[in-house]
Swiss-Prot record:
GO terms for molecular function: toxin activity. It comes from Conus textile (Cloth-of-gold cone). This is Conotoxin 5. GO terms for cellular component: extracellular region. The keyword Disulfide bond applies.
Amino acid sequence: GCCHPSTCHVRKGCSRCCS
């Protein structure tokens, strides 16, 4: 799934950032 832009670079479980 996608992660919030603020935590995208921090969370390893996300495949991409949410726009």
